[in-house]
Amino acid sequence: NDVVYESGLAAGSAAAGNGEFAYGTFTVSDADGLDDIDSVTINGTTTAIGSLVGSTFSGASGTLTVTSYDSVTGIAEYTYELTKATTDVDLVTETDVFTLMANDGTADSAQAKITIEITDDIPNAVDDTNSIAEGTASVTGNVLTNDLHANTQPGADTPTSFVSWASTSATYGTFTNTGSGGYKYELDNKNADVQGLDDGETLEETFTYTMKDADGDEDTATLKITITGTNDVPGLTVDPDAGGGGEGAHDRQECP
């Protein structure tokens, strides 16, 4: 079988290549000589042998074009172009099949087939990062935004969608799933570990998520949130009565 790749489609992971094309040949014959061949039928469409070159035939997922025909040998060359992504089914090989018959004006030949095997494209979940400074209330984001292949394409089977978070349990704050890959992280600024951070010191929270493409292929990545310590304002307490108060003792005063 000829093989094409969904990754070669416009949104595919290798869109700059030519993976969506396949090339091959088929041969017509007649015991009485090739001059007797009148027409060829491909996928139910009959074309006169003299008009075969340049003819295009539609398949389930792409098109087959006859690019040459040698009337001496009976060999025809074709190009197949995958034009859309398929719906992938587990344990099933996706194919586009073309049936062919030759006719000499009185009878059809036995049926032959051209089978194009279609290789599925996959999504690419990319690790995410976000940051929040001590004293800040919250940060938000969406982990699907950067889930692209190296060529900045999402993969042929679009749209991609969010599946789930492995866990939303947080150590230094509260993590909320806001839907469709979105999240909100609220920092607990009263947490002892957060308050204990020196200026520039960090803590990290990591969350794992799963996304999928339109035909169900899944991929997993992580979101890492970095908490950065800031310089806390010092406090000062004045207590005039600390040494034993008498008349004229002043009220206790505190400076932030």
Task: Give residue spans per PLM region.
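Acidic/polar, solvent-exposed loop/turn segments
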Residues: 1-256
